[in-house]
Amino acid sequence: MVSAFLHPFAKPTRTDFRSIVSGRGSIVTDSEGREYIDAMASLWYCAVGHGRREIADSLANQASTLAGYSTFDPFTNEVVEELAERLVAISPMADARVFFCSSGSEAVDTAMKLARLAHVQAGHPERTVIISRQRGYHGTAYGGTSVQGIPPNREGYGPLVGDVVQVPADDIEALATAMSHHGDTIAAVLVEPVQGAGGVFPPTEGYLEGVRRLCDQHGAFLIYDEVISGFGRLGHWFAAHRFGVRPDLVTFAKAVTSGYVPLGGVFVGPSVRSALEADPSFFLRTGFTYSGHPLACRAALANIDIIEREGLVERAHHIGRRLSAGLHSLAADDLVAEVRGDGAVWAVAQKPGVDPMAIRDRMLDMGVITRAVGADTNTFCPPLVITDAELDRVVDALTQAITTA
């Protein structure tokens, strides 16, 4: 019999879910007492690991003082102001501001709206086109569904948001052609610097630089979706730092709190904020009930403290080198078709005839969590506190799952 809970990204008729009841570090435990190495940081987000007492204590203290309150005009709170300042200090854009929401999906939809709105405020209401890329994942709200480049996730929902153009990933000539065609109707180009749920695809050499040049040439904003890549995953605070290419808007979520409380946001760079701030009578009419929620902001502050104190941004390099070496050893032994990744997020493409979902399930039975995405890919995005021994067990389990297929 199905439960009352309708699961996301699952068959509505499925009944045999594994119930996770606790977590500590990189290990989670299910209701049957089985332990798993969480090689996906839950869903790309638990950077500091599970069961961090400092975050739990900070939440309890905050809840006893101010658990929640609106930040709509005329209100604010000390925690959201402190977090905004903290985030701007590590932002890839100088003189940015921060808009808060509760998820990456909300962040993407907000970035799309702000890009279009900034053009309206600058006197260019014709600039409405958003260009996105194939394989891109940008959440499942209506805006994100409309721009994402994973076709099955777009199907069945009727008409989506208009004025969206999609181009092949990493094909700078295709992007140049699309931008020439749409010209001064383009609002923004939206990219994941490293595509995540689409299969973990880092950018090709020079691609992001080319996108920036084209945006400047055509007067379009560049939006980075850093919901997965932000907060140390690539060995830098943000992918914009990693690749040295400046965007105009950056979305974030996931590892900003390591998932202890949902939080998302958008860095609003100078080119966008200047358009929004130019008219003192302009009133920004977008936001969410929980924008700047004190508990979420407190969780983020405690989480960032841990990342800084424990050097987890730097540790991502070590994790990436060790995980990459292990996965490439499988490729050298002709066990996988391809290895892709950057920093501490990696994937393997299975050889023809190997089902990544079956690999996922076999690894679960061996006590290791991976994800299966697309037709051939298994992904790995472990907590940044994972030990070397745990990383080696991940690779060993993957090897065993493939060789016993």
For every predicted segment, state its role.
Residues 1-405:
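Conserved N-terminal phosphate-binding loop of PLP-dependent enzymes in the Aspartate aminotransferase
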